[in-house]
Every structure is written in C-alpha cells, then in structure tokens.
C-alpha cells in the first residue's frame, strides 16, 4: 500500500504526559499511540522508541523530548513525553512544547508524590489550561477504597493549584496491560476512555490567526516618499491596510495607521499570523519605533514592568553560570526581540539560586514591555543565555 500523505482534515491539539518519575508516563504514551493506531490508523510506537528521546534546543537550552502523534475519531494529537524530571521543568518553562492540555499520570499504588505536585504547580505557573488524570497501575491495587482515597488526594492537589479538582476526568487503568493488548476495563477500554476525555474535556485551542493582531518589531526602516516600514513576523491575528494599530512597549504607547503590508516585495491587502512582513505606518517617524516594541490591535496588550515568573537557571554544563545568584541580581530579560534589564527578588526564605535550579521570582524591569501572562523570556548576561522563564502573574 502506498504511504498515505498527511492530510490535516481533523483539528489539531497539543498534549503531553506529566507526573512523578516511574509512575508510567512513557508506558502510557506508548499505550495510547499503540491502541489508537490500531483503531484509527497511525503509527504505533514502542516504549524504547519513546524513551530514547532526541535532544532539541529551545531558547538556548538543550532538552530531551519525545514527540508522538496519534488520532482519535475527532482529532489529531501531537503528544510530548520527556525522559527526565529536569527535561519536564525546562520544557514547560521554555514552552518548547506548548500544551493545550496535559495528562497527569499518577500511580494508584503510590499516590501523589513530590513531582506530581511540582508538575501540577508548573502547569499552573506556565499556563497549561487543562489537566486530565490517568490513575495508572490500578491492576496492582485490589482495594477499591484505596483507589478512592488516591483519587481524592489527586483531586485535592489539583484544587490546591486552582485546577477544578471535582470536575477533572480521572481514568483508572493500567498502561502496561493496555500496551500488552489487554482488552479489559483497565487495558484498552481505559485508553479509549482517556481518548474520549481528551476529545471532550480539552477544548480546541484558538488558532493564532483568530487572535488579536500582534507583531514584535524586528527592524525599522525609513523609505523616502513612503514613510516608516516596520518588519517582523506576525505572531497572531490579521492586519489589513487602513486599520488602526498601537505601538506598545519601552516608550509611551502611540497610535498609528497601517497604510501598507509588504511580503517578498509584493504589496498585500493583509498579513496574517506566521507571515514575515513589512508594515508601512502613517505619520510615524523612524525614531518613534524600535526593536523590542510590538505593533498590535489597539487596547489588546498593555506595557508592564513588574511581574512574577517561573524560571529555570541553566547549569554550568549547559553553558550557564558557574556560581549562584542572590537577591537583587540584575540580568537582562530577553522578551521577543530585545533585552531589558531587570532586578530579581527571590521568594522569602530563599537565600540564593544555584545553576540548575527552578524557582519562582518577582521581577522589576527598567523599561515596560508589552506583556501577558504566559509570555516566555530568556535571562541573559552580556548576550549569553543563563536561564529561561515565563510570566506567571503581572503585578504592575
């Protein structure tokens, strides 16, 4: 049979497995891919294919991540699984693999463990919007009351980090049984139930093109007789000729009008998410716009200087700092296209941060940046990346 070409007929959703080490994340990933491949087509993946995750780089940080694809009757999923705990932390903070929803794997035999808690907290901090729970290894627990107790603990933990514990789907099963071809309620049936929960509990993500127009400014040119052209890649939304836009960040917010959109030297009526374009601005001087600002739909994004963030600090081996840093450390924060200096305040009782740590911090920037919760940044010292982070909460 000829190899079928990839046809994107089903809507696409990004998910991933999270949870404590050895609770069965990779086994479950293999089980989902195998069971759904048999049902809806696609490629079954063996455990060792997933476990040997290739290295990739995101924001200057090396991360091991395995990518698996599978389909349900309604959707196409891209699923990420990480071999080690540090990879999860890095993955979630850098947004290397953005998740529309996560599958929290928790062993019924052990109940919630430290990384179970840490991954739920990380999911909350980095803005993973939905969690589904797979209570794994249920074949090892004979006591129904014990299962109920573990389920209750998981729901309480989700509640604690502002996920709707009572409404979260929790599926009981055994990834190992499912992978071995067991057709029973803990085997294949549990995987089908999980697939059903993915389809019904995780809403379709908003497509980038449907968002409010936003384009980070990469370069600014002055073209005689035509005015000022700003180039960059449109992050989301659509810009049409004649529309009003705002220039946000670094300086005071200004209003202007898009009088032209150019791509590959051709004039267009509009540009949309993903396009690399030049946007012509009416009445705006070349010195009024600079790299690091954004063009956006008026009122859709505001400039901020004060926020809390979740950061990962590169270890020495990863090319990071060799020494810890302390309260009031002042590196550069690289947002989208530019560096802004900021001061770091550590959480109470935290003396210092070692290379290789992840930590929640509060930051005050010297210049405002167009910012939303969930925005990613790199932390740099003289152009060298020493960490990565995500805006958890805007304070001012």
From Swiss-Prot:
Ranges of residues in domain tr-type G: 10-206
Region (G4): 136-139
Residue numbers spanned by region G3: 81-84
Residues engaged in binding GTP: 19-26, 81-85, 136-139
Localization (cell): Cytoplasm
Region annotated G5, chain positions: 174-176
Keywords (A to Z) from UniProt: Cytoplasm, Elongation factor, GTP-binding, Hydrolase, Magnesium, Metal-binding, Nucleotide-binding, Protein biosynthesis
InterPro entries xrefs: EF-Tu_GTP-bd, EF-Tu_GTPase, EFTu-like_2, EFTU_2, G_TR_CS, P-loop_NTPase, Small_GTP-bd, T_Tr_GTP-bd_dom
Catalytic activity: GTP + H2O = GDP + phosphate + H(+)
Record-listed E.C. numbers: 3.6.5.3
Stated family: Belongs to the TRAFAC class translation factor GTPase superfamily. Classic translation factor GTPase family. EF-Tu/EF-1A subfamily.
Protein name, entry field: Elongation factor Tu
Organism listed in the record: Polaromonas naphthalenivorans (strain CJ2)
């Amino acid at each position: 049979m000829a190899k079928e070409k990839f046809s994107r007929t089903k809507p696409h959703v990004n998910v991933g497995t999270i949870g404590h080490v050895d609770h069965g994340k990779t086994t479950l990933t293999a089980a989902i891919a195998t069971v759904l491949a048999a049902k809806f087509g696609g490629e079954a993946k063996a455990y060792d294919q997933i476990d040997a995750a290739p290295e990739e780089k995101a924001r200057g940080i090396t991360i091991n991540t395995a990518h698996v694809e599978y389909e349900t009757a309604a959707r196409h999923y891209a699923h990420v699984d990480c071999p080690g705990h540090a990879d999860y932390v890095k993955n979630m903070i850098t947004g290397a693999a953005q998740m529309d929803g996560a599958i929290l794997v928790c062993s019924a035999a052990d109940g919630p463990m430290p990384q179970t808690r840490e991954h739920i907290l990380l999911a909350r901090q980095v803005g993973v919007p939905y969690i589904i729970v797979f209570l794994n290894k249920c074949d090892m627990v004979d006591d129904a009351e014990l299962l109920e107790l573990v389920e209750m603990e998981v729901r309480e933990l989700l509640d604690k980090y502002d996920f709707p514990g009572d409404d979260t789907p929790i599926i009981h099963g055994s990834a190992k049984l499912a992978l071995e071809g067991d057709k029973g309620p803990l085997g294949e049936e549990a995987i089908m139930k999980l697939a059903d929960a993915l389809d019904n509990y995780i809403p379709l993500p908003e497509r980038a093109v449907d968002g409010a127009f936003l384009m980070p400014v990469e370069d600014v040119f002055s073209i005689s007789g035509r005015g000022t052209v700003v180039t960059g890649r449109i992050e989301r939304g659509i810009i049409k000729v004649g529309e009003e836009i705002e220039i946000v960040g670094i300086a005071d917010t200004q209003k202007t009008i898009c009088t032209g959109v150019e791509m590959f030297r051709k004039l267009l009526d509009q540009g949309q998410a993903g396009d690399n374009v030049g946007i012509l601005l009416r009445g705006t001087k070349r010195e009024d716009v600079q790299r690091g600002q954004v063009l956006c739909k008026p009122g859709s994004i505001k400039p901020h200087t004060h926020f809390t963030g979740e950061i990962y600090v590169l270890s020495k081996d990863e090319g990071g700092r060799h020494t810890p840093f302390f309260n009031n450390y002042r590196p550069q924060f690289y947002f989208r296209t530019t560096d802004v200096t900021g001061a770091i305040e550590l959480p109470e009782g935290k003396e210092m941060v070692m290379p290789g740590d992840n930590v929640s911090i509060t930051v005050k920037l010297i210049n405002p940046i167009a910012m939303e919760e969930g925005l990613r940044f790199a932390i740099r010292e003289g152009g060298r990346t020493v960490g990565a982070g995500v805006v958890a909460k805007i304070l001012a």
